[in-house]
């Protein structure tokens, strides 16, 4: 019994030693030392996931803004990072060449160290993700929907002709549409659709056929800008 208890205590002690401390990360933390910029990142996203990725060496602006960004953030804790970057960019442009020169020298030194440590390094920018194409179909044009609703055909329209009057009105409309006289069909269809919606749904099929068989407006070919090539 004592042997079992001792083995359990030993396992618990080993597991407790293997548990990392809270807040401790697996990579080297950032410091104010410029050489810390050369560390490798692990666990990156994208194509570098699971592989070590080498960071680019800092340029002169990054060397200068490293301390300036911390100073501005302490003075303005409510300012967003994008606004801080804009302010630092404006301040950097206002510096003279003599004031910028020490930071250019430091950047050249860091680049030389980077080349010595990573001689085969090549900068490979990450590709921007392409927007995914939507599979949703675009809504149909109102004119095509209108034509499907207004066309009076025994195959499409839900009612049948009960008397000779409604059938004659239907044949009359077909003769007018197929005649050689040019007609502004689009405007006529819009007028008929508006009139159809204004009527009650309780109207009989004969009444609807009478409304649809109204004479369409006549427009001469010169007004429409059409030639005889479109009409026989």
UniProtKB/Swiss-Prot annotation:
- InterPro entries from the UniProt entry: HMG_box_dom, HMG_box_dom_sf, SRY, SRY-related_HMG-box_TF-like
User: What are this entry's molecular-function GO terms?
Assistant: calmodulin binding; DNA-binding transcription activator activity, RNA polymerase II-specific; RNA polymerase II cis-regulatory region sequence-specific DNA binding
Q: Does the keyword Nucleus apply?
A: yes
Q: Where are the transmembrane segments?
A: none
Compartments in which it is found? Nucleus speckle; Cytoplasm; Nucleus
Which UniProt keywords are listed?
Activator, Calmodulin-binding, Cytoplasm, Differentiation, DNA-binding, Nucleus, Sexual differentiation, Transcription, Transcription regulation
Q: Where is the DNA-binding region?
A: 54-122
Give the SUPFAM superfamilies listed for this entry.
HMG-box (SSF47095)
- GO cellular component entries: cytoplasm; nuclear speck; nucleus
GO BP terms: cell differentiation; male sex determination; sex differentiation
| Superkingdom field | Eukaryota
- Asked if the Swiss-Prot or TrEMBL record annotates the protein with the keyword RNA-binding, the reply is no
- Pfam annotation, one family: HMG_box
Residue ranges, annotated region (Disordered) = 24-53
How does the record describe its quaternary structure? Interacts with CALM, EP300, HDAC3, KPNB1, ZNF208 isoform KRAB-O, PARP1, SLC9A3R2 and WT1. The interaction with EP300 modulates its DNA-binding activity. The interaction with KPNB1 is sensitive to dissociation by Ran in the GTP-bound form. Interaction with PARP1 impaired its DNA-binding activity.
Q: Member of which family?
A: Belongs to the SRY family.
The UniProt function text for this chain reads: Transcriptional regulator that controls a genetic switch in male development. It is necessary and sufficient for initiating male sex determination by directing the development of supporting cell precursors (pre-Sertoli cells) as Sertoli rather than granulosa cells. Involved in different aspects of gene regulation including promoter activation or repression. Binds to the DNA consensus sequence 5'-[AT]AACAA[AT]-3'. SRY HMG box recognizes DNA by partial intercalation in the minor groove and promotes DNA bending. Also involved in pre-mRNA splicing.
Name the UniProt record assigns to this protein: Sex-determining region Y protein
């Amino acid at each position: 019994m004592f042997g079992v208890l001792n083995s359990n205590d030993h396992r618990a002690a080993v597991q407790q030693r293997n548990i990392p401390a809270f807040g401790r990360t697996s990579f080297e933390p950032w410091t104010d030392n410029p050489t810390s910029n050369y560390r490798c990142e692990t666990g990156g996203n994208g194509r570098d996931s699971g592989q070590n990725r080498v960071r680019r060496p800092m340029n002169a602006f990054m060397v200068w803004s490293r301390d300036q960004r911390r100073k501005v953030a302490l003075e303005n804790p409510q300012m967003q990072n994008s606004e801080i970057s804009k302010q630092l960019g404006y301040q950097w442009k206002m510096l003279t060449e003599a004031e910028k020169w020490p930071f250019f020298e430091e950047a050249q030194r860091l680049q030389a160290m980077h080349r010595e440590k990573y001689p085969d390094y090549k900068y490979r920018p990450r590709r921007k993700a392409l927007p995914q194409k939507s599979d949703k179909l675009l809504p149909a044009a109102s004119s095509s929907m209108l034509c499907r609703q207004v066309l009076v055909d025994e195959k499409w329209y839900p009612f049948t002709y009960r008397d000779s009057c409604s059938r004659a009105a239907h044949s009359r409309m077909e003769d007018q549409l197929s005649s050689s006289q040019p007609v502004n069909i689009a405007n006529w269809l819009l007028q008929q659709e508006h009139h159809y919606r204004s009527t009650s749904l309780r109207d009989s099929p004969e009444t609807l056929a009478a409304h649809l068989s109204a004479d369409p407006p006549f427009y001469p070919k010169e007004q429409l800008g059409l030639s005889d090539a479109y009409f026989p």
